[in-house]
Amino acid sequence: MTIFLLLSSLHPGNYLYGQEQPDTLSFYLPNILVTAIEPKIPGTVSLLPASTLEHTQPITIADLAQLLPGGLTNNSGVTDAHYFSVREVSLKNGVNQFHKNAAMGAQIWVDGSPLHFNAGINEPYEGYDARFLSLNQVKEAEIIRGIPSARYGNLTNSVLLLKTHQGRMPLSTSIRYNPKLKQYMLGKGFCISPQDHTLNLLADYTSQGDFHTGGIRLANLYHWLPAGKKLELSLTYTSRIGKEKQFVNEQNHTQRQRLDQRFSIQGEWQPDRRWLKKLSLRIDGSLQKSKQTKSQVNNASSQLYTDRKESGEWEAHVLSSNYMYTLVNESRPFYVETEMLVSTFFPLRQGREISLAAGFSYRSEGNEGRGRDFDRQRPPSTSIRPRSFREIPFLHTFCGFIESTYQTPNFQIEAGLRHQGLKSRDYAFIYQTEPRLNLLWSFFSSPSGYKLSLKAGVGWISFMPTLDKLYQESVYNDKVSFYYNDRNESGNSLGILTTHAPGRVRNIELKSTVNRKIEAGLIGETPTFRLDMTAFLEKQTNGFSSSEQYIPFSYREYDYLSTTQLHPEYRDGQVWVNGEAVPFQEKYSYTPVPVSVNTLHREKHGVEIVADFGTFAPLRTSLIVDGIWLCVREKNTALNGIWPIQYTDKTEYPYVGFYDKQGGPGNENRSEMISTNFRFITRIPRIGLVTTLTWQMIWLYRYRTLYNGSTGENVWPLYWCGTDGIIHPFTEAQKEDPAFAPLLSTTAPERFLSNSYKPYGMLNIRVSKAFGEHIMLAFFANNFADLRPTRYSASTRSYLQQNTQPFFGLELQIKL
């Protein structure tokens, strides 16, 4: 029906581009924007004004990605972690999911302050989990998909700039409800002086199932005009808590908690001098506490445990056969950052202008958490030790940039250079220099409204190693050397463990991961149509991964004593029974030790398109079509050891193979996707109604796993080592040696087949209804037609159901 009505309105002269026809009865509903805007500035940027956020009803910032070209709908809800990233093939088994790894390289700024999560270790909630950043306070968002300004750094994916309400906030409240999720918000602004200094207060709460989060935000804004020069000072404090319970039964339950506290002090002075137009200073701080408490029953029978952290042979605790343990993980990452910016501009003749900006920042971050702790008499497992994060050194980051913009009526160019470095104990200075360039050239313009513009950009962006990459956890391998337990005599037992503690293996050559971007685009405009098309290429090198080294060690295995009423004892490094030493054999084994490496390489290329067909007047319906063609190739060249667990005459297999493949079937993943969104936007100002019907289509989706560009059903190692620890190249002769036969890695051939699915789509609807100037009621429904086709996956030989389940919600906003 909608398509029929739309086609019936396609009559010459019945549509307007970018505007509504006059409506004398419209007195409270402006021509609001409900989609992302592609602004006319250098770079590839999407703007999301307040009206778009109110109409779209995103639950977290991760939902904003669906407004980008070719963006896909997420299954709304907060029971699972949310992550923000752009230009990623986030489909998995035909369902759109969040791309966790790419989210680490997305930089988020709130009112000019970046959020950093580089000091989190073993957290139950990752710092960049979008559920802990409220969108209720956000009034405008800007997403930089291409090459960002030189001011923004420590990223490899994108920049998300969030702006909160400026000035005095009206009394506002909103209630969002659906069968699973509930959200509440209340905010109010106050004038606290005759000079219109303001104080804004906001509180919100979100709940779904066992997950709960809520927070408050206080924002002060002061401004003066000393000697006629503008001076502003803003003070912001944000506190947020989160809590979740997973109760299986009385013997298995987990509780997670998180507390975020952030403050920001920003000052800006505009002396309006020739060489100094603006001077600003920012001081930020953040303290986060994440805690997970897990209680579970250990049903293992009579295990041995020691908490020694040195290599050697130790008398161990004999654990009970059945006991309840409690494992606590506490992480307290924090950072303090300061930044100073200066800028000026010089007007030239004929509407030309040159602007200059420079800045310097310093950040110190660490983790003061208790780490992992538990009762030593009731450990969660063997070969586990307590670990305090307070022992880990701090990270210190230094950044500086300079940037210049030259602008004429038809041409803009922005060029900048950024340099950032990271210093920590035990590591040399890690640094990276990043040149960046963006330009926009309007090379054709006619009086009748026809325009053609060219945009292009090239630049480097990089992401520094995080605390957990630089200081990985120490590894402990415990082997049972002797165990005696007299079932007829309680307490007559003795256990001896040999601990191999190779410690941490640090990669002192660890570098920052670098993404080199290049893009070019064309913008065409007519009085009734606008097209924005961007082609891009991204090559990310030195991505972070982990490589397992296998370190051999020897241990003693004492003879088994089956006779009862013996009383063995351990003294002078030997087990004794009745004054005689118990015989033993020398055995060999390996300890896998993970090492951070720069072996992940990603290449992305594709085309983004946004076409605005203007407004069809009779129906007051506009059509915007956006889409993306995206290809992603990811390869990990890490050398990983694999030790076949085989025994011959009760002796462990003596060789370890080293392969250029990961734990899966191969070392390379390729994926390709073509998706579009047809957004039909209808505005009826007389009754204050705006509706958006989105037809989302995935025309092409395919992915494949490869081994070095081909299949890898049978893969021999590149290197091998024995119990002497010496690594040797693997030769053709050894392939014929039966002793090395267990090192052949085999994979089913179908695991390397290409998975490709027929086109499929879904229908989403958004409805906003204004009641006067102060009340707004909004409704949304995702996949309301329940389009969930079944497709066959060749690589797994299984059938998969595409698309998310139907999901809907309702929101009421009141502003006074």
Q: For the regions a protein language model found, what residue spans apply to each?
A:
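C-terminal beta-signal and adjacent terminal beta-strands/loops
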Residues: 542, 696-747, 757-760, 766-816
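Short acidic/polar hinge/loop motifs at secondary-structure boundaries
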Residues: 113-144
